[in-house]
């Protein structure tokens, strides 16, 4: 009986150590994830298409659920190149520098994936970030406009 208990203890301890090793995130990865989100936000405000593009996976899907006056919802989406083109057009430059909110919070990281909350002046983004070819890039964005201030 003691052998079984000892063996279970060893197996359980090894499982915990493996799980812990997989969930440990390096400071370098945390910094790279944060920088990716900042490239996205700051690239928008600066109308810097190259910086925006650097932050995005080429197959990015950016989505928002919009609800019309009748209460019917639809899903609108754009891809990476559309977002880069909007960035280059300079829409972000309409936000005064002192109003440019750029709050980044890493919500979770596991292996080569991360979830990040990015708060901008007019909207909140939930980013899915992945390490692709050694570089952290945004793969998915689900976003919502902030209510208009009166």
Give the predicted meaning of each segment.
Residues 1-5, 22:
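Positively charged n-region of N-terminal signal peptides that target proteins for export
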Residues 6-15:
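Bacterial N-terminal signal peptides
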Residues 10, 22-24, 150:
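Compositionally biased, proline/threonine/alanine/serine-rich low-complexity intrinsically disordered stretches
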Residues 19-50, 54, 58:
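Short, low-complexity N-terminal intrinsically disordered segments enriched in polar/charged residues
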Residues 45-85:
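N-terminal, post-signal-peptide region of Sec/Tat-exported proteins
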Residues 115, 124-149:
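Short beta-strand edge/turn micro-motifs at domain boundaries
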């Amino acid at each position: 009986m003691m052998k079984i208990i000892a063996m279970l203890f060893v197996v359980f301890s090894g499982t915990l150590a493996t799980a812990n090793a997989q969930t440990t995130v390096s400071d370098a990865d945390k910094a790279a994830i944060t920088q990716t989100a900042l490239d996205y936000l700051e690239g928008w405000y600066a109308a810097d298409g190259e910086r925006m593009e650097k932050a995005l996976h080429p197959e990015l899907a950016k989505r928002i659920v919009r609800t019309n006056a009748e209460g019917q919802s639809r899903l609108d989406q754009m891809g990476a190149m559309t977002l880069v083109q909007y960035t280059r057009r300079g829409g972000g430059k309409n936000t005064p520098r002192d109003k440019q909110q750029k709050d980044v919070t890493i919500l979770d990281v596991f292996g080569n994936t991360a979830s990040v909350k990015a708060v901008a002046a007019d909207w909140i983004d939930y980013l899915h970030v992945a390490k692709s070819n050694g570089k952290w890039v945004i793969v998915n964005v689900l976003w919502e406009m902030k209510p208009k201030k009166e």
